[in-house]
Amino acid sequence: MKVTRILWLPLSFLNFIERRYDTMTTQKQSALQTIEEKKSLIAGIADKVWEFAELSLQEFKSAETYCEALEKEGFDVERGTCNIETAFAASYGHGRPYIGILAEYDALSGLSQEGGLIERKEKKAGGNGHGCGHNLLGAGAFAAALGIKAYLEQNDVSGTVILYGCPGEEGGAAKAFMARDGLWKKLDAALTWHPEDVNEVATGSSNSCIQTQYKFTGIASHAAGAPERGRSALDAVELMNIGVQFLREHMSDKARIHYAITDAGGCSPNVVQPRASVLYMVRSNHVAEAVELQKRVDKIAEGAALMTETTYEKKFIDGLADTVSNFALERVLYRNFEELGVPEYTEEENAYADALAETYDSSGVPGVAAENDENAKEQVEKMQKEYGHAMNGFLTPLYQKDAFKAGSTDVGDVSWLTPTAQIHVAAWPNGCPGHSWQNVSCDRTEIGHKAAVHAGKVIAATAIDLIEDTSLLDEARAEFEKRTKDGFVCPIPADAVPVIPD
């Protein structure tokens, strides 16, 4: 696999030069060469998981594929971590520092798609697909673990790498349940990545998120002949929704409440509906606020039941925290990303990505730096123009100020318990819509494979730096302690278990 080293200068266009390891230690070079030698294994696992396309908390084949591969590679593997069936933890090494690498492997419903095409074509009618690239995410984390293991194996140093298999990121929030159980506290640092349309070190906060299902039960009756005997569960759902609409005036600007009626009772209007359900999602950029807002939504559900003389059952689905940035770790990731450059694409790969980008609006300037800084935006625009293809074949500037994304991820829960940082590696052309068939198609190409392998190298190189120079971990820990001084408010009840909504 070829990569291009990119030097970013504030007042210049891209400069493409040959990749050099001049400043890399021989030990680090050797570890990264292990990843290069095993790229067929890494790509093969990515493709297997892509084929399985298992939904959240149902990733049995995907998880076992990783467990078997990790055992063959000499890791100690624990299945069913934190009593989550499709979770695992694979470790190698001894002593501190403990470096955690986070893997995901769940797919999305309704996104079945043939790989490598530039047109919509379902692989299986109504089937699932990896619209968020988690087949690549897990494979890249696996690659990183292989590289770190090689380093620990070849050098007489203290250190332990733990690859965590984290199911249900799209629904189930396994990392959040693991956080509730204290799993992440033992780590000195956690590193991960996500496929994107850009090469960058990710930063900034995200929304916390709590999902709860409310199931109302009433009494059926003839809506015309004996309406007084009926108690409408559907009325309760509607009154709950009205109550929440009035709550919106009394929450912060960044808070959000979404809902979906998952059961309207039936399709006969002349029946007083005896059952109805609604699924609520409460978001805020601070997990403590989300927890308090959720309590108010619970009271509205109780009030709706009282008004309609129905009963209700509350079913906790999942909850996750906002993300805590760690600039110290992000700087180490960026130094290694700069040194390793970004994946290089063939003419055929660029032609495919260019054609795929014609199927959606591919305009826009990518990356967190461009979103938050006008000077950075100008630089990235120049980089795009210089590169001249839909793939963003360059590394965007490091951004070290506050930033915010409205979405949610259970990586946030990890970041509240240990210093955490992540990168994005381009696996799709610019502006590729999230959770789309285009993503699924690109995930099953060499472009996707290159992203996974390269992410593994950047993460492994960073972990090696942390092991070799623990003062970097001290700096990251000091920043972490400052940012989390108010303490972690866990959104997961003590008795909750990961579930799939009805």
Task: Please annotate each region the language model reported.
Residues 6-23:
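Short, Lys/Arg-enriched N-terminal segments with co-localized hydrophobic residues
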Residues 26, 44-48, 119-127, 216-224, ...:
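A short small-residue
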Residues 26-130, 135, 139-143, 147-159:
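Acidic/His- and Gly-rich active-site-bordering loop/insert found
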Residues 27, 38-45, 58-69, 97, ...:
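General structural feature for long, well-ordered alpha-helical segments within catalytic domains
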Residues 49, 101, 134, 163, ...:
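Divalent metal-coordination and catalytic microenvironments
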Residues 86, 108-110, 118-129, 135-136, ...:
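Histidine/acidic-residue-rich, glycine-tolerant segments that coordinate divalent metal ions
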Residues 238-502:
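Metal-dependent amide/peptide-bond hydrolase catalytic core
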